[in-house]
């Protein structure tokens, strides 16, 4: 795997941090540290024990990712037409649980692609930096778009998740990573 693919892998593992950022109102510094720590730790553990669990994870990790992103897309589209209050991460326990749940894909990617990663230190550094960056982008983008149109935020977010999920499924079906 070339250095460019290692970089893309690291960034793609952390894109879901955007979700946490858009859901948090307070404790953003704590959230940024938590999201970075969870992604790096779970990715590193996945890389280290990938040989033991790789055969179990690699057969269905793309399907789980697709279903998760499809769920997020449908949830965003539901919020587009609904006037219900949006789920907020407003306490430490919710932040930690959501951060951990959304970091599990880092574990699966680390476990299933450990032999293709040639620049492990670089990948870990990029994950440590990009997870809080995407989280902060979600936080700031949500605040800016709500000022103008929260409906546009839901539509954009849903479409983004649908594209990512579809690409993951297409990649799996076509035999790619």
Locate the predicted segments by residue.
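Structural signature of hydrophobic alpha-helical transmembrane segments
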Residues: 1-15, 59-68, 120-133
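Alpha-helical transmembrane segments of multi-pass membrane proteins
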Residues: 12, 43, 47, 68-78, ...
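C-terminal ends of transmembrane helices
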Residues: 17-29, 73-86, 135-150
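Cytoplasmic-side transmembrane-helix entry/capping segments in multi-pass membrane proteins
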Residues: 27-38, 88-96, 150-159
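Hydrophobic alpha-helical transmembrane segments in multi-pass integral membrane proteins
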Residues: 44-51, 104-115, 162-177
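Selective transmembrane alpha-helices of multi-pass membrane proteins
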Residues: 55-82, 149-177
